[in-house]
Amino acid sequence: ASICEAIAARQPDADCVIFRDRVFSWAEIQNRTRRLAQVVHEAGIGPQRRSPRVPPEHLNNWESSQSHLALYMLNGNEYLESMLGCWKAGTVPFNVNYRYVAEELRYLLTDSSAEGIIVHERFTPVLQAVLPTLKKQPKLILQVADDSGFGLLPGAVDYESAIAQASPTLPSFLTEGWSGDDMYLCYTGGTTGM
């Protein structure tokens, strides 16, 4: 999180992300990821006040004391923004293999204790089938529009609308702790041999 901020401060107008016909400067990515972090924070995901996390020595090697947020997405600027936005909100993003069937997705969301999901529209039919089977419902579902035609999932919030309405100003307790323990939780999807 802090590396993105440092580069944006030094070269705000330089290209940061180029995806298809869209070009985003470092300043634009800084702004978009801060706004996304605010959306995540306001949903009650991640630290809500200054508080110590569970010390690493009190956790097993595979455990995380932070909130987890699922990235059920294709590659694109929104994926990178989501990773950075999660870190800026003090949460841990993790990947979801978009080839998963409902039972695999249910297992992953349950095992990870996902508190939120950012999902491309094309994957909402599988997610919609899984949501009623989860014991713990996500606090936030952000949906990235695409050309699939499925429409907005009930209870979901449009990604672009959410970040457009959010403030880029974050609570100081979040910004003071950036990058001290940024993590990315990686679930293998069984595609290594493909």
Positions of predicted regions on the chain:
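A short N-terminal helical cap/helix-turn-helix that marks the beginning
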Residues: 1-16, 28-31, 35
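Short beta->alpha linker loops
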Residues: 21, 28, 74-75, 100, ...
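Solvent-exposed alpha-helix faces
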Residues: 34-38, 113, 193
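Structural core segment of the AMP-binding/adenylate-forming
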Residues: 42, 88-166, 173-175
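Conserved AMP-binding/adenylate-forming
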Residues: 22-23, 39-103
